[in-house]
Amino acid sequence: MILITGANGFVGHKLMELCKDTAASPSLRNVTQEMVNRMIEESNADVVVHTAAISDIGTCEADPEASYFANVQIPMYLANACKDSDRKLICFSSDQVYSACEDDGPYTEENVKPGNIYAAHKLEMEKRVLDILPSAVMLRAEWMYDYYEKRSNYLMMILNAIHTQDSVSFSSKQFRGITYLQEVAENMEKVISLPGGAYNFGSETTQSIYEVTNKFLDMLGKKLIVKDAPARHNLWMDCSKARKYGVEFSSVIDGLERCARDYKL
């Protein structure tokens, strides 16, 4: 059985929907180590997939203590509980750990330099969890998208802009992956078998997010003004480490095409 934290959230709800033999964890708000130990033990789960987090960068900057508890302390509680009961732990990290790297990328797992509190806490989480539980898997996830009205994401941003005919802004100088959430869920069975460590996790691209957006609009047959925004730091990952173990994603463009086909956009 797979116990999923954050089961009502953007990532968690899709894992609950598509993965076999899942259970939703109770809320982790204000938990203690003892509470987490009891939750894990009573779940009878073989695997814990931790998706719950405070992921808004601005929120983390405004309240670093809350960010630390949610993004570092709770994963450590889970790692201790899984270590004591010999369970596999999968934690979602972020491509933001590359947000201050000095070169342009694409970045491999060793070349990290966080540029904000959220990113720093995610990187600290990875290190502390792996110190406790070396078999744990850290997934450095990209900006994920899906047809999901409860949370803004790349797809909903584009569709809403088409509806309102507002312009969107993306930089022709920024390279980053974006990932179809369906493919995240489809890869979880292989993720569970990964050796412990950190993995770049998502779709790869050789085109800027500005180019990708224009191609996606062409694919949809829609007209929209795409402004070329000022250059932003790349979040451009090399995902070959996970791919060696069979974790496969469509390219960014192919993923968007698949998503459009799935939802008949």
Regions found by a protein language model. Give the residues of each.
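NAD(P)-dependent short-chain dehydrogenase/reductase
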Residues: 127-176, 183
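Catalytic helix-loop patch of NAD(P)-dependent Rossmann-fold dehydrogenases
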Residues: 69, 73-77, 97-139, 145
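C-terminal amphipathic/interface module of NAD(P)-dependent oxidoreductases
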Residues: 222-225, 229-265
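Rossmann-fold cofactor-recognition segment
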Residues: 23-34
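NAD(P)H-binding glycine-rich loop region in Rossmannoid oxidoreductase-like domains
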Residues: 32-70, 81-83
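N-terminal Rossmann NAD(P)H-binding glycine-rich loop of SDR-like oxidoreductase domains
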Residues: 1-19
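SDR active-site strand-loop-helix element
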Residues: 5, 48-52, 89-95, 139-141
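Mid/C-terminal beta-alpha module of Rossmann-like enzyme folds, strongest
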Residues: 187-188, 193-234, 238-239
